[in-house]
Amino acid sequence: MRAGLGPIITLALVLEVAWASELKPTAPPIFTGRPFVVAWNVPTQECAPRHKVPLDLRAFDVEATPNEGFFNQNITTFYYDRLGLYPRFDAAGMSVHGGVPQNGSLCAHLPMLKEAVERYIQTQEPAGLAVIDWEEWRPVWVRNWQEKDVYRQSSRQLVASRHPDWPSDRIVKQAQYEFEFAARQFMLNTLRYVKAVRPQHLWGFYLFPDCYNHDYVQNWDSYTGRCPDVEVAQNDQLAWLWAENTALFPSVYLDKTLASSKHSRNFVSFRVQEALRVAHTHHANHALPVYVFTRPTYTRRLTELNQMDLISTIGESAALGSAGVIFWGDSVYASSMENCQNLKKYLTQTLVPYIVNVSWATQYCSWTQCHGHGRCVRRNPSASTFLHLSPSSFRLVPGRTPSEPQLRPEGELSEDDLSYLQMHFRCHCYLGWGGEQCQWNHKRAAGDASRAWAGAHLASLLGLVAMTLTWTL
């Protein structure tokens, strides 16, 4: 019996050590099954009927709109007025639903969630992304500065009204405790409730985690893009939130100040890296998928991202190992014929060719390096290596009919291409797969080991029975 089980135990130990040294597996992709998806979540549906400017969005894996009145979409955004009784202060400083979370009513809030979720996501299948966009206050006390300081002020006033004899430092300490406790309860219970209503969807909060690396404004010459240590530590304080999420939705909207500079890539890179760190560190069973919000234009204007900044946003997010990017925008993109025409030109000439290139490059890397069971991630996060189709190996050709892809690659990976991928990228395997190239099926391996163990035990038992019969006879 020992001789029969020895190799099995040794193999099990070897597999356990090998699997433990890998990246924590990540959730498999949804939608198209691609390792990197690109979604269009911009309300441009009026360009064709209102302005006679149809937009071809076939190159995007997902098309949705954040506007009110659209249901059963692959991406659903729940703003504060679409999901329960979110406590906040309005633009005039008036309290809404209690103002601060400790003044809100979870008992009234939670029963309203089911109706809201079922209104916007009317079926359990197919799986999709569900993004809660609550930006009025932040659950970490010290992050409520500038216009959000009203939440700290109101919290202090609530405590002072109950304890007028307390010193100010005690009031602040108690106010912080009450605010953070209530904020945690509101966010956690909301997540748990909506996940129970639509468990197949991937749920998370927009702009979580954040990195607060906007100091390029004050420190342009010395700007590195790194997340301040204090912000990383405060993100770790939100471990309770990351453990409940099923996806993360950081944002990398670019200010025009960053256009065509090395700082744009640094700004994006460290924000995505921080999200990936949180995704890997604070979730028990697997690394959470990270979907990065971006915009087709710079913030607060309609100037389109140039090629360099597309690489800094989409390309950087793909190379670091995010699950995809989500282009977000508001109704201004379709507010006039001129805006629609400009957007159509940008899509056709710049954006679509680039996203097709990156989408297929990530797919080829997954197929050739990870057996299609994982996505490629940079070996060195800071390296200037990207998942791009080589122009010497591929060209993009348009589809011949409306049913065909808008653009598709024509060509094949060369030996140099394969060497480049192997040298600069490694695999991040999906749940159930392991090994350097995601070649091991964990479930199958576990089943084989169990069957081998059972077979060895059965053989030993049969041998014992045979011996017993021999002695009896």
Curated annotation (Swiss-Prot):
It is an enzyme of class 3 (hydrolase). A lipid is attached at D448 (GPI-anchor amidated aspartate). One of its GO terms (biological process) is cellular response to interleukin-1. One of its GO terms (cellular component) is membrane raft. Its main location: membrane. Keywords: Cell membrane, Disulfide bond, EGF-like domain, Glycoprotein, Glycosidase, GPI-anchor, Hydrolase, Lipoprotein, Membrane, Receptor, Signal. It is a lipid-anchor; GPI-anchor. GO terms for molecular function: enzyme binding; hyaluronic acid binding; hyaluronoglucuronidase activity; hyalurononglucosaminidase activity; receptor signaling protein tyrosine kinase inhibitor activity; receptor tyrosine kinase binding; transforming growth factor beta binding; virus receptor activity. It is found in: Cell membrane. The active site is at E135 (proton donor). Disulfide bonds join C47-C340, C211-C227, C365-C376, C370-C427, C429-C438. Residues 1-20 form the signal peptide. Transmembrane segments: none annotated. Residues 449-473 form a propeptide. The keyword Transferase does not apply. Residues 361-439 form the EGF-like domain. It catalyses: Random hydrolysis of (1->4)-linkages between N-acetyl-beta-D-glucosamine and D-glucuronate residues in hyaluronate. Glycans are attached at N74, N103, N357. Its EC number is 3.2.1.35. InterPro entries: Aldolase_TIM, Glycoside_hydrolase_SF, Hyaluronidase. Catalyzes hyaluronan degradation into small fragments that are endocytosed and degraded in lysosomes by HYAL1 and exoglycosidases. Essential for the breakdown of extracellular matrix hyaluronan. Interacts with MST1R. Belongs to the glycosyl hydrolase 56 family. This is Hyaluronidase-2.
